[in-house]
Regions:
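The conserved SAM/SAH-binding core of class I Rossmann-like methyltransferase domains
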Residues: 9, 36, 79
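N-terminal beta1-alpha1 ligand-phosphate binding loop
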Residues: 2-27
Length: 166
């Protein structure tokens, strides 16, 4: 995988997925990189595409879904971040949803997901919800997850990504 030209294409709303994209770019040979940036026609020239997304309602963001649905005959490494990082099963469900948008002529050569921090407005919404007598039973767990996510992607997340890439 390291001897061919590649592109790193990503969507990042809060900077989390950008951190992963930067790490991949740091690891791989610079001279083999055809494109680094957001979804763009020139990024599709490479045979190997590293495609990064942020999670929106259990799937990739709409820009990424639109981009990947048009790809044909590519090798694809998926990477993404999600605010809720409770389990690998959750990450696998997201990846499964993303893969279902990819044409069968493409080959998935790898994948990686980790937790990512969320905007402060999310925590404020949770706290406001908790004040309501009809708040969800899991509201404390949601607030705890938000607080845990603040440091992600962290050094351990980036090291795990590096180990998958190399």
């Amino acid at each position: 995988m390291h001897n061919e030209n590649y592109s790193i294409i990503f969507s990042s709303m809060t900077g989390n997925t950008r951190k992963l994209a930067d790490k991949i770019h740091e690891i791989l040979p610079k001279e083999s990189c055809d494109y680094f940036g957001t979804a763009d026609a020139q990024g599709t020239e490479s045979e190997l595409l590293y495609i990064g997304f942020w999670t929106d309602k259990g799937n990739a963001d709409s820009d990424t879904l639109d981009f990947i649905s048009k790809l044909k005959n590519k090798k694809i490494f998926l990477f993404g971040t999600a605010g809720f990082g409770g389990s690998d099963a959750y990450f696998q469900r997201i990846l499964g949803n993303v893969k279902s948008a990819i044409d069968s002529s493409n080959t998935i050569v790898g994948e990686y997901m980790c937790q990512g921090k969320m905007p402060q407005s999310v925590r404020e919404r949770y706290v406001k919800m908790k004040e309501s007598p009809e708040h969800p039973d899991n509201i404390d767990a949601l607030i705890e997850n938000f607080d845990k996510a603040l440091s992600h992607p962290d050094a351990d997340d980036l090291e795990r990504l590096k180990n998958i890439i190399i």
